């Protein structure tokens, strides 16, 4: 049987700061590669077909992100095995975030377009686990009267993350 938490139990100290930093990081994880880094890698890996190669890579990554978003939402909604004070979605974020980092790191060293494409698609799966679950973790953790504050944090850190990812 699930225990319904009170408003005081649902709002951990410093949650809003941690949430903002985490969401900022999740945006930088895809904004930097998509807007700057992958294009530069195409110039190196496929100079004669860089535009077509980048388009293919982004299309495959985008399709992976769409499908992954559906799967990650489904998986998180059925995570009955680790419901705690921080909800059932935060553990997915904590598991996937390091995998995003490892995937991006490996992408920077790949000498092959197809390996890069595979890694980018894998990173998209992990980014979906991080971003989608961060977007919905508020339902588990934050009292309803603070949803507007969290929405403002998402808007600010999203914009700042895009700028930071391309700077």
Question: Model-found features: residue ranges?
Answer:
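Helix-loop boundary and gating motifs at the non-cytosolic
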Residues: 4-62
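Intracellular juxtamembrane helix-capping segments at the cytosolic ends
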Residues: 38, 129-142
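Hydrophobic core of transmembrane alpha-helices in multi-pass small-molecule transporters
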Residues: 24-28, 103-107, 113-130
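Loop-to-transmembrane helix entry/capping segments in MFS-fold secondary transporters
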Residues: 49-55, 144-154
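Residue-level signal for discrete positions within transmembrane alpha-helices
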Residues: 27, 62, 101, 124, ...
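Central cavity-lining transmembrane alpha-helices of secondary-active solute carriers
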Residues: 55-78
């Amino acid at each position: 049987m699930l225990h319904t938490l009170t408003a005081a139990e649902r709002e951990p100290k410093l949650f809003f700061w941690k949430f903002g930093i985490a969401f900022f990081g999740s945006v930088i994880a895809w904004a930097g590669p998509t807007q700057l880094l992958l294009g530069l890698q195409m110039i190196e890996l496929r100079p004669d077909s860089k535009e077509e190669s980048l388009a293919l890579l982004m299309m495959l990554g985008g399709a992976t992100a769409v499908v992954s978003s559906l799967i990650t939402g489904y998986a998180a909604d059925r995570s009955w095995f680790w419901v705690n004070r921080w909800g059932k979605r935060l553990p997915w974020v904590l598991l996937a975030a390091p995998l995003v980092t490892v995937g991006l790191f490996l992408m920077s060293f790949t000498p092959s377009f197809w390996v890069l494409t595979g890694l980018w698609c894998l990173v998209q799966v992990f980014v979906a686990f991080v971003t989608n679950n961060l977007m919905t973790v508020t339902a588990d953790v934050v009292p309803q009267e603070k949803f507007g504050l969290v929405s403002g944090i998402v808007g600010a850190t999203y914009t700042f993350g895009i700028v930071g990812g391309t700077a």
